[in-house]
Curated annotation (Swiss-Prot):
Known EC number: 2.7.11.1
Source organism (scientific name): Arabidopsis thaliana
Source taxon at top rank: Eukaryota
Family: In the C-terminal section; belongs to the protein kinase superfamily. Ser/Thr protein kinase family. In the N-terminal section; belongs to the leguminous lectin family.
Annotated glycosylation sites: 55, 125, 128, 181, 204, 225, 267
PTM annotation: Autophosphorylated on Ser and Thr residues.
Cytoplasmic topological domain: 308-664
Gene: LECRK13
Region (Legume-lectin like): 24-257
Organism placement in taxonomy: Eukaryota, Viridiplantae, Streptophyta, Embryophyta, Tracheophyta
Induction behaviour: By salt and ethylene (ET).
Function: Involved in resistance response to the pathogenic fungus Alternaria brassicicola.
PROSITE patterns noted in UniProt: PROTEIN_KINASE_ATP, PROTEIN_KINASE_DOM, PROTEIN_KINASE_ST
Domain Protein kinase: 342-619
Stated name of the protein: L-type lectin-domain containing receptor kinase I.3
Length: 664
């Protein structure tokens, strides 16, 4: 028998310990669908889990309490911590509402004796100020009550046994970022967070909007000894009331604990949404309707004018000869939007025939848009025909021409954007890293392959006529892409190109260009000069150097003749290269710049030499045409009307490639 009593005593102790532990742990409700609450008055839990304390019914109150009391034994450490989210929604946003929400700690969940209106469903005339009430109320009051000595505006207050607050403040929160208090509109209908913390000495009340973390400083901090007010068992909950002024008062979520470290966080993202009042539709009076009509007519006229102006602004010229090129044509409006209206901050280059802009198409593709003017109809027709034909060229080492747009006196050319700019930026600009030997030889192979394709891999022979480092673009992987077809010419295989003005850049132009005209061999000559430019790290013509070094081809030849060919390499190459490979490429450059066109290799052979699929033919400094450099003078070019300058060419036609920050 004694054993049974002993076991029963043990079980009772365990039960009491568990119960005490449960009470100290507290609770958390992210919505109130499954909440264990005592509810009375007009309070109710809505289907979405929202706790509604009052609605827009006059002179009513509602209560919601946690059903189990908490142990607040004055002999032990007395503290509690709570965090809840509420919303006060008047019948019409921006209007007054009443009367407010109160967080209550009470010895009883029966507040039927309390009054509505300014008493907030907690107090009454009979119990105001009496110590026997044992009530703590944290009020969010939206109506001024003169008899309670309340503030002019909605306020937050601490009430002890009476609706007259012992401490109050206008609703606001401390901004950690700004270091000052920011006001809060209690009747905005927006969710508001409230923290009430009591550590045994100080009662702190803190507010913040739903999207703000708990501020570092409370709104109210009051030294209070709640052990003189609290009984051993106390209930926690909410109260709300209406009067002649009405509001929907909601609680979205609630967390409570006797201990700070055990207070569970609310999941703010999952809380139910607050229903806001719908705006009433007002009927328009006949007078107002008439005024609206009188206003609408001029507005319609203005909009019509704007529409006409925009149509004229985006109008594009189309002729019968452009129909066959339709798939390559962009609308002016799409390019206008892609470049943000051709804003200055989108401009990335400027050439002899127009400006270059970076743009982005709706799908995210980056493009380069060259904007130029024209007035010669026949010349523009020929240009469009040639450019669109080039749009059909497909090779991995060509800058893809995507299309064009013709509008009034403008032509816009669209190509793929090359993010790493042009090769000359890395060869001659000290601020950029110098390409390694591997990168240089790889780029040379890329451009040789592209030029071989233009000469032999297309339906018509394509002559580039302006090969140089500034026209070699680098994609995101630093692969070489041949661009700038502004000077390009086409002719059928088996026929010769009709005589045209000599074009190009000094130092890249073959000696026979003036007398014999353009051919595949003149492209080979330009490639040879470009090849030496890349390996030697200097431009083909530099007048500021001593006479013996001004012309790159001549200087490399003289160094070979003096058995010091190796010293012509770019000193920035470092040591990571094969000497025999450097020597082979330098000699190939001299072979391609042979003064005798028939002695120059075809681009197909150049590709084989660079890939070392074919040995370089044996020749020496005494071989006819090698090193016989005959520079085309500026005077001679001017005499035949060539548009060309040192270091950059002003093309007969416009470039369609883009130099990232530098234009032709």
């Amino acid at each position: 028998m004694a054993c049974r009593l002993y076991l029963a005593l043990i079980f009772s102790c365990v039960y009491l310990i568990c119960l005490s532990s449960q009470q100290e742990t507290g609770f958390v409700y992210n919505g109130f669908e499954q909440a264990d609450l005592f509810i009375d008055g007009i309070a109710k839990i809505l289907p979405d889990g929202l706790l509604q304390l009052t609605n827009t019914t006059e002179l009513q109150m509602g209560h919601a309490f946690f059903k189990k009391p908490f142990d607040f034994d004055p002999s032990s450490s007395l503290s509690f911590y709570t965090h809840f989210v509420c919303a006060l929604v008047p019948p019409k946003l921006g209007a007054d509402g009443g009367h407010g929400i109160v967080f209550v700690v009470s010895p009883s969940i029966d507040l039927s004796h309390a009054y509505a209106t300014q008493y907030l469903g907690v107090f009454s005339n009979l119990t105001n100020g009496t110590s026997s009430s044992h009530l703590l109320a944290i009020e969010l009051d939206t109506v001024k009550t003169v008899e309670f000595n309340e503030l002019e505006k909605p306020h937050v207050g601490i009430d002890l046994n009476s609706p007259i607050s012992v401490e109050s403040a206008l609703p606001s929160y401390f901004s950690n970022a700004l270091g000052k208090n920011i006001s809060i509109n209690l009747l905005s209908g927006e969710p508001i967070q409230v923290w009430v913390d009591y550590d045994g000495s100080f009662l702190n009340v803190t507010l913040a909007p739903i999207e703000i973390k708990k501020p570092n400083q409370p709104l109210i901090s009051r030294a209070i000894n709640l052990s003189e007010i609290f009984q051993e068992k106390m209930y926690v909950g909410f109260s709300s009331s209406t009067g002649n002024l009405l509001s929907n008062h909601y609680i979205l979520g609630w967390s409570f604990s006797r201990r700070k470290e055990q207070l569970q966080s609310l999941n703010l993202s999952t809380l139910p949404r607050v229903p806001l009042p719908k705006e009433e539709k007002k009927k328009l009076s006949p007078l107002l309707i008439g005024l609206v009509i009188l206003l609408v007519i001029p507005v319609v006229m203005v909009l019509g004018g704007v529409y006409w102006y925009r149509r004229k602004k985006y109008a594009e010229v189309k002729e019968w000869w452009e129909k066959e090129y339709g798939p390559h044509r962009f609308s002016y409006k799409s390019l206008y939007k892609a470049t943000n209206g051709f804003r200055k901050d989108c401009r990335v280059g400027k050439g002899g025939f127009g400006e270059v802009y970076k743009g982005t198409l709706p799908g995210g593709r980056h493009i380069a848009v060259k904007r130029l003017s024209h007035d010669a109809e026949q010349g523009m027709k020929q240009f469009v025909a040639e450019v669109v034909t080039m749009g059909n060229l497909q090779h991995r080492n060509l800058v893809p021409l995507l299309g064009y747009c013709r509008r009034k006196c403008e032509l816009l050319l669209v190509s793929e954007y090359m993010p790493n700019g042009s090769l000359d930026q890395y060869l001659f600009h000290e601020g950029n890293p110098s390409p390694s030997w591997y990168q240089r030889i790889s780029i040379l192979k890329d451009i040789a392959s592209a030029l071989s394709y233009l000469h032999t891999g297309t339906k018509q022979v394509v002559l580039h006529r302006d090969i140089k480092a500034s026209n070699v673009m680098l994609d995101s992987e630093f692969n070489g892409r041949l661009g700038d077809f502004g000077m390009a010419k086409f002719h059928d295989r088996g026929t010769n190109l009709s005589a045209t003005a000599a074009v190009g850049t000094i130092g890249y132009m073959a000696p026979e260009l003036i007398t014999m005209g353009t051919s595949m061999k003149t492209d080979v000559y330009a490639f040879g000069a470009f090849l030496l430019e890349v390996i030697c790290g200097r431009r083909p013509v530099e007048p500021e150097l001593p006479v013996g070094k001004q012309y790159l081809v001549k200087w490399v030849y003289e160094c070979w003749k003096e058995a010091c060919l190796f010293k012509t390499r770019d000193p920035r190459l470092g040591v990571e290269f094969l000497p025999e490979e450097v020597e082979m490429v330098l000699k190939l450059g001299l072979l391609c710049t042979n003064a005798m066109p028939e002695s120059r290799p075809a681009m197909e052979q150049v590709v084989q030499y660079l890939n070392q699929d074919l040995p370089l033919p044996i020749f020496s400094p005494s071989t006819p045409g090698i090193g016989a450099f005959m520079p085309v003078s500026m005077e001679a070019l001017s005499a035949i009307g060539v548009s060309s300058v040192r270091n950059s060419s002003v093309s007969m036609f416009v470039t369609h490639t883009i130099l990232d920050g530098h234009g032709r």
